[in-house]
Amino acid sequence: MGIESFIKDKRKTKDILVMGHVVCGYPSFEENFSALEIMEDAGVDLVELQFPFSEPSADGPLFVKANEMSIKSGTTVNMCFEFMSKVTKRFSFKVLMMGYYNTIFQLGEEAFLSRLKDSGGEGYIIPDLPVEEATKLHTLSRDLDLDPIILMTQTSSDDRLKKLGESSSGMVYAVARKGVTGSKTTMDESIDSLISRCRANTSVPLGVGFGISSKSDLDFLKGKADVAIIGTAALQAWETSHAIGYKNFFESLQIS
């Protein structure tokens, strides 16, 4: 079952789905696995496994640090794929690769997609790859039933959103505000407007991310978006209180 069908099926019984995020190898793969166990117990539906990169341009300070520390500890792309394989065999949530195009470029597009497929991934999120430069990659992806997740932003023109919508597959990642990940996003009419504009340009499910951090944020998105994407707030909870803080954070969202 692809991402689109998976989300639509789960939405029959859930007002909104939740997608979590870990940076592979930070603080360690063992702690990643513990975090994923907590997420599954809390009812998380999808998870991004971020392959660390030295210049994560879409990420805020906390994730930049996580990427840097993971690389310094010796994390490799091969280790990330091996971890993904372990994760997809163990957990029921769907797994997406998140990263930057340099990772794909270094492997080669066909080799990257083959490894992703073999590791049980459902698709990928590459925020620094414009759709105009991704035609071949997206075609190869769909031949393997892998979904390239497209990002839509508030600053995109209607013509741009239409073009992005035509390239969308699996789900769309609606970026809730300008800038990088990490800062709190105010849930207001600007988010409603973004969601409406995205909906007008794609028929695939819609996820909203960047600054989603609380149950009230999830409640705001219910009936509007299909997936709430949570990254920095969860990692901050781990940084502050490790597994206990992480568990308390996800329990506070009351996902299930």
Regions found by a protein language model. Name each.
Residues 1-21, 85-88:
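N-terminal amphipathic alpha-helix/helix-capping segment at the start of soluble metabolic enzymes
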Residues 72-75, 120-133, 147-156, 162:
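Catalytic beta/alpha-barrel core
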Residues 65, 73, 151, 161-200, ...:
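Glycine/Thr-rich beta-alpha phosphate-binding loop at enzyme active sites
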Residues 59-67, 235-256:
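C-terminal helical cap(s) of enzyme catalytic domains, especially alpha/beta-barrels
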Residues 44-55, 123-125, 129-133, 172-182, ...:
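Glycine-rich phosphate-binding active-site loops on the catalytic face of alpha/beta enzymes
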